[in-house]
């Protein structure tokens, strides 16, 4: 099979390797699409090395089909039957640490991830070991594989929004109009909220299409003024920081209303710091919260939302590349040529 593996930090190699050997309690999936994110690019270029196993096959946003199951597994009981279209949650949690037993398996102390510590989706096939069978999530009805691959980023956004008071007529400010910010716009609009998106001019039209009623490129005091005007001087009920810029933190806090919530969704550079006015947090009684990864329940909900058509993210996938041209796919991510870039096994592009 063809696979894109990390030979060493910054060296991504496209190679032919044997199809993984199926153990008695493993499952083998045929990959149908893997969408890329900034993390994949940082790993491929050597900027991210923590938690990355040398030689690992990259790709953690995965849509696939069950190909074979081990002799000791029962189809439809232990794992979906061969031929079933599935999403694959990337988080393999231990189930035993304090985080796992308290319901936060998304921040498991011994987390392993498909695409960083375990071979991921930039290959023709992916082996799912026994301890990760619960990550295999069948669809309610079949959908385009690149769309199904978006269940992973959707599940992470869903994890955050489930912890925020977003409902009908809530005012939600989304900072950042990359794919993650756009998904947050769609989720907030789905919940009935009114959404303002702030980001680069080129991404404002997609933000409007995905649920933002108003958009802005303003920064700093200009953004605060925009939010005040939009909310009648009250401020946003919820502010979601969807891009890893520490400079947005003080502005986000200024934009929140009394009793408002600020979600630190984006990951920030290692060692990053932000200056916060503690009196704003104190006197406005603000709630600041973080969110990372997703639980299996979040992922299952995301697959269900996509496969039932409850939420439409189809416009996010703007480019498809064959696996044999994965270097061009990563270049498209680097140059921001589109929104989400999908990589598919050779012969499947456009199908």
What does each of the following model-derived ranges do?
Residues 20-34, 48-98, 140:
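Glycine-rich beta-strand-centered segment in the early N-terminal region that forms part
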Residues 77-80, 166, 256:
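Short, well-ordered loop/turn sites that connect or cap secondary structure elements
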Residues 141-220:
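Mid-domain Rossmann-like dinucleotide-binding core that forms the NAD(H)/NADP(H) cofactor-binding site
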Residues 222-232:
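Short amphipathic alpha-helix with an adjacent loop that forms part of the alpha/beta core around
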